[in-house]
Structure formats: C-alpha cells, structure tokens
Amino acid sequence: MESFKLRLVASHMLAPSVRHLAFERADGTPFAFVPGQFIQIHFHYADGSPTKRSYSVGTVGNGSGAVQRLEIAVSYVEGGAASALLAQLDEGGTVDASGPFGRFCLHANDNNARYLLVATGTGVTPYRAMLGQIRTLTTSRGCRFALVYGARSEVELLYGEEFEAFAREVPGFSFHPCFSRVPRNVPRAHDRSGRVQVALAELAPDPATDIAYLCGNPDMVDETFALLKEAGLGVPQIRREKYISSR
C-alpha cells in the first residue's frame, strides 16, 4: 500500500446521481492492483479534521498487470463531504489517495465450476474490473459466471451496455438485470422484475459447484447471504463486501 496523488483526466455521468471518474497518478506511475480491490481518497471536513472514503477500482484491464487509468464510480450522497469534493472536481484537479486495499477478489486456488456475482448500485464496479479475468477463466478452467445486478430502473443500471456486450462475446458469462421499480421500455431476455433474489433463485445456487460474491447495499448482502446459506452454500463459498454511504 502507498499514498499518491491522482489527477482527474476524464469523467461522465453514469446515472443521474452516479459519476464515473477516470484518474491517472500525478507522478505518471501505472497503478498496480488486483481486480476487486479498492482505493481510499483522503480529504478534510470543513472544520479541518481528516477523513477518507473507499471506492472500488472499476478499471477493465487484463487482470494481471498495472493500468494507466484508475476508474471509480461515485454515488452522490445528499450533504456528503466526499460527494461535494468529487462533484466539483474538474479535469486536471487532484486528490490524495492510498491503496490498493481489500481481498474481494477472484482466488487463484478456486476449483468451482460457477461464480454467482451479485450487486446493487455501485457495487457492480469491482465486477467490471474482473472482466479480463472472467474472460480468461471461462476458457482456461471452463468456469461459468452469472452477474445478477439490481437497479431501481434502467437509467440506474451502471455499465449495463458493457455487460450486455460482454455476455454476447463471452459464452460462459451471463448478465441478469433486476429492476425493482420500473422495467425497461423494451425488456431483454434476461431482465427480471423485482430484487436480485428473484433472479438468483432461478439460477438455483448449488453448493457443489458455486462460489458467490455479494457487493453493494448492506441489506441486500445480508438477505442474499441468508438465501445462499439456505441453499446449502458454506460461509467460505460466500464472499461479501458492503457499501455504506457516509456523509
């Protein structure tokens, strides 16, 4: 782990309240990380006290080397100090950061046949970073991957077109969007109405073949963890990361 400055080089809105930000290290050094890890951005509250926020790295690489750009997705919290900082950051602006951290990663010694990747909101970001690894594992080990992603409506389906395109390109990967409030105007084959547990139940989790990853809203993570345990998966087969909004 090290500390460094990041310079914003590009950004765009992914959804009405979610911004995609692409940074490069100010010193020009490529950023080495394992897909699934996160960074911390350091700043100060208005009273001068130091604080930090964690963001999963969403950069799509080959899964084994350093990358030039470090990409994150920031969900804005009303009155949030980090939200204000990153909403006002212009291209060329810098922030202090450290990392990488975390173990929410695909494990080299896994021997399962299928991965169930479950997310809500910006919790889908680490799975985007894993796409290079996923492509490799579908051929090297014959693994299958099912990404179950919950959003309230199509406009909040982050990186949805990327995942749809990847599913068309990689036969061992399937994408299952779940819309809890408003379905798409033009539904697609894998779309489901309701929460992620609906699609997950249809996938019939199997302790003999599956390892599950859960990332996003804490309630979703807890409820899905319970569902998977009821299906027979052991605790080591369920890997979790909760996203908690902070001001």
Q: Which residue ranges define each predicted feature?
A:
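Short helix-loop-beta connector
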Residues: A108-A113, D206-T209
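Acidic/glycine-rich phosphate/pyrophosphate-binding loops and surrounding catalytic core
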Residues: L89, N111, R128
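Generic structural signal for buried aliphatic residues
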Residues: I39, V95-S98
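Reductase modules of NAD(P)H-dependent flavoproteins
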Residues: E2-K5, F145-R247
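Short, charged beta-turn/beta-strand-edge "cap" motif at the junction between a beta-strand
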Residues: H44-G48, G99-F104
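A phosphate-binding catalytic loop at a beta-strand-loop-alpha-helix junction
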Residues: R114-M130
